[in-house]
Each structure stands twice: as structure tokens, then as C-alpha cells.
Swiss-Prot record:
Species for this entry: Streptococcus pneumoniae serotype 4 (strain ATCC BAA-334 / TIGR4)
CDD domains cross-referenced by the UniProt entry: TPP_PYR_DXS_TK_like (cd07033), TPP_TK (cd02012)
Task of the protein: Necessary for high-efficiency recombination chromosomal DNA during genetic transformation.
Name of the protein described by the UniProt record: Probable transketolase
Binding site for thiamine diphosphate: 64, 113-115, 155, 184, 259, 434
Amino acid sequence: MSNLSVNAIRFLGIDAINKANSGHPGVVMGAAPMAYSLFTKQLHINPAQPNWINRDRFILSAGHGSMLLYALLHLSGFEDVSMDEIKSFRQWGSKTPGHPEFGHTAGIDATTGPLGQGISTATGFAQAERFLAAKYNREGYNIFDHYTYVICGDGDLMEGVSSEAASYAGLQKLDKLVVLYDSNDINLDGETKDSFTESVRDRYNAYGWHTALVENGTDLEAIHAAIETAKASGKPSLIEVKTVIGYGSPNKQGTNAVHGAPLGADETASTRQALGWDYEPFEIPEQVYADFKEHVADRGASAYQAWTKLVADYKEAHPELAAEVEAIIDGRDPVEVTPADFPALENGFSQATRNSSQDALNVVAAKLPTFLGGSADLAHSNMTYIKTDGLQDDANRLNRNIQFGVREFAMGTILNGMALHGGLRVYGGTFFVFSDYVKAAVRLSALQGLPVTYVFTHDSIAVGEDGPTHEPVEHLAGLRAMPNLNVFRPADARETQAAWYLAVTSEKTPTALVLTRQNLTVEDGTDFDKVAKGAYVVYENAADFDTILIATGSEVNLAVSAAKELASQGEKIRVVSMPSTDVFDKQDAAYKEEILPNAVRRRVAVEMGASQNWYKYVGLDGAVLGIDTFGASAPAPKVLAEYGFTVENLVKVVRNLK
């Protein structure tokens, strides 16, 4: 029976990829046995309740092998993955896109495809489970108690981010993380002996993982036994499973020819004969469906029913905790953060927005028990520390400060995993110039609709002495170009509070907070509530103004000062703070016209970053005071003066406009 089911997985993949004339059959054919063993003997999932929060998680880090996952979901009874959807693999509007997409297809626990990010994201799942278990489980009531399983390939383990995350997972002793390594000695360009020769198991042993070897990737009992041993090891586990890529293909197995191209009609016919598969394309024997129903769907439904009974009893035994758990199960924060939680600020108060961020962050932490995060070894520079808590580790699982180490990319992927798990609000920080290191993870935050908060400090050439390697220029423009990411560059402590409030109440959009090292004065025109519009008027000296200054962040202080100087010279001027171009762009036409009247063409945008995205606001008649070269090393006042970010120069720029 098991051999028939394994071959059903293989041929669903082969047939769908042939029909699409696109895809990666090799991993489907080679990894089918380990995937079958995992689904039928280990995974607790319920196709009728795909979002059950205590389900085991499965991450196909080798996302190019998506038909392996779609075949498993179809056979297990997930309604989203019907046979018609299998036949529509990689087609417009289907539930079976080329790589797995979270939120698009029920049963997909994470978007994967960019190699290395799946295994790294899985680390976040495991850490989320550990925190929630420590927070809410009580004796006899293991409400949060599940494993995170991964299938990865050689390519995943070549990527640096997987090494970052594995080092971190070993240090944290995340013992409910089990990785099955599809070790087939082949990559897209040829054999791995030409590019990847170290002992992976030795490396993972050094990280503090349990490791094991299954020499025959078709030995279901050996795979099952290895997983059982791994679960009892007390460590994260890597099980190397030696497989043959394209198993069963007489002429292509064991070669890179089967990695990323359909088998084609002739080779498919030969493979059917070689594996004894006497069924038509997309024909699955009823006994295969029965096998998956018994060992996946029914087993999962029983586990779900037992868990719901446990939760009901928990509500009786621990009603206060149960109220928070119920919110988490429903996909809500256990406590609502409101604007009233943030203290009022006096005009004239001066503070760096990174410090204002720490104040706001701690307001959130005091209110929301499931709010946690950290920094890539810069907590006391990024100001990301929750003051009431210590560092989280295996011995201190309830602490909410996470020390990610100098692992920016892994930090982002781990945050994604924690957000995907559900039940948590998470954040992570680094210097803004190093947002490049984490950007690929930010992109998956945005693509998956995860409300992760990224805290990026030291936001401009005002860093000064550290010089151009640490002075962001192009970074704001790059992040603003990313769909479904709200970038906030607040002007002062008041706007910073508002940005944090919007970040921790966001449902489907991540947030990047771009913050200063230097002090900024709270302007009398800044407004907590208006930050939600993305842009608003902070200064105006005449109703019939004919000039608009648009600024963000530290340049709002500069723009207001310049506007007051211009006003003293008879100019009629408006200053607009635009903390988020992303949010402002989503406002209706009437609001945009209210803030930036089309009739007023004399406009200057002021920002210490690349100028390119500001012309949409100032037009061809306006000007941009920005930076389109790299920065320089000198004390900050000297750097700012040399780059023209002074009241005198801004006044001159405005005066030069017709």
C-alpha cells in the first residue's frame, strides 16, 4: 500500500508538470517517500481545519518542488487542492502556483521558493511554539504542543541564511524543529561535488543540532525511526536522507536533467513502466485516497477533537488565561493596544526618534503580553529592549527580548516564522544601512501579508563620523518601491508613537520604522492621529499659500525652520510632514488635493536620501533637496552643511524656484 501511495505522489507531480510544461519533477520523485512517511506517520494536521493553531507545521523549504506539497495536500483531502487545481498547476488564477504561497492555498504554512528562507522561517515557528507553550500551557493542559517539520535540499543549505538560522536554533535548543535534508548530490548546474562538498552533518553537529543519516531514501521504516529518535533528542534535528533525484526515470534519474524540466511524454512512459504505474495521467487509485484519509485526515481530525476538548477544560480551569488563548485561536491579539495607551508629549520636547521608539515599544510591551522581538546585536543602539524582561533562551522561555546576534537576514526570516505561526506581534532591529541584509526577508513579510515591524535606526548621513558605509542613501527609495510595505520616517516623538501604534495594529502589512540617532524637537504642528493619513499639514502661515515644502523625519524640523525664515521674508508657505509615502498614496483623491493642491506648483521636497521618488509629488516645476551620491565621514553638522541640509540652503532652493 505504501509503495502505491508513494508512486501516486510521484505521478501526480510528473503529470501536472508535464501538463504545465514547466516545473521541477526531480525533487517530487526523489523526496516522495520521506514526505509520505512524514505526512502519514508524524504530522498532526486536519484538512477540515487547515488553520488549527496547534497543528504541526510543514515547510517545504525546497519550494521549487511545490508539486510534492500539492500532491500531498490533494491526497490528504484539502479542498483547495482539487484534481482540477492539480491539472491547473502554474496557471493563472490557480491554487497551485509555481511556488507555495501562504494565504493563497489552504494547507500552505509558509511561502517558499527563495532558497534558505524556508528552513530559516521554520526556526521562527519553533520559537513561537516554545514561547506560547511557556506562556499558556499549564500542568495537564498542553494547549500549544506541536512540531515544525521541514524538507530542504542542498541549495537551501548552501544559502548563508540557513547557516545563520541553524546556528541560532542550536543555541536556542529549539528541539521541536525537525529538518529532513533531501541529499541527492545534484543541483541545477550539475553535481554538488563541484560546488558543495563539506560534511553538512558535521557542521550541524557543531551548531548544537542532533543529526542522523538515512542511507536509503526509499526506506520508510528507517525514515520514521530517524524522526522518532530526533524528536526525543532534546535538540533541533537534521536528518540527512540520501535520495536519487528523479527516482524511477530510467534515463534522467540521478542527473540535473530532471531537476527543472518536465520529463516529457517518452520518459514519462518509461518511468511508468519502470515503477509499475499502470494508471492514466491524473488517475489515482481509490485505495491511495483511503490510505491518506485514514493516516492523515482521520488521524488529524481525532487529534483536533481531543485538543478542542482540552481547550474547553482549560477554560474551566484557567479562565483568565483562556480568554487570551481564545483570542489567539481566533487570530486576534489577546489585548488591544489603543492610542490612549501612549502618553501625551509636550511641544518642544527633544529626543532622537530611536529613543522615542523605545519608549513607544515599551508602552506596547506593557500592554500586550504576546509582543516580543529584538535586534541583530544592536539592541542598545536600535533601542529595541523591553525593559521589564531579560533575554529569551531555553532556560528563560518567557522573556521577550531576543538576541538574534549579527544575523540580520535570519532575524527577518525568524520573525516571519513567528508571525506566520500566529498569536504573536514581533519586531526586529538593525541599522538602516543594513536593511539590505534583511531585505529578502522583508519582501516575504510583505508578500505573505505579515505585520512584522522592522526597526531601522541611524537613518541618514547624520550618522556622521561612521561615514558612507553606515550612511543610508538609496534605502528609503528601495523599501518604498516594495508592494505592501508601510515605511514610516517619523518627524518626532509624537509621530513615532503613532507609527508604532499603526504598526502593532496592522493586520496584513509589515512596517519599517526609519529612525534617527540625533535629537529631534517635537513640533507644535505634529499630530498623532493624522499620521494615519501618511501626510498632513504641520505649518502654514497663510491660507493663500503659494509654496509647499514636503519633508520626512529629521527634515521636518529643518523645513519648518526654513518656512518660518521664508515667512519673515514675506513668503506664503505650507509645510507638509509626510511620514509615510506608502500610506499617503492610499488616500483618496480629495485628501491628496487637500494636502497638496494641484494649483500650487511651487514645491520642494526635502529628505536625506535618494531624490528619485519625490518627483511624483513636486512635479517638473518643483525641486528636491536630496542625496544622490554616497555620504562622507565627518562630524554630523559638517556633513549636513556640505550636503546642503541647512536652513540657509533650503531657503535658497525655495527662492530659486519661479
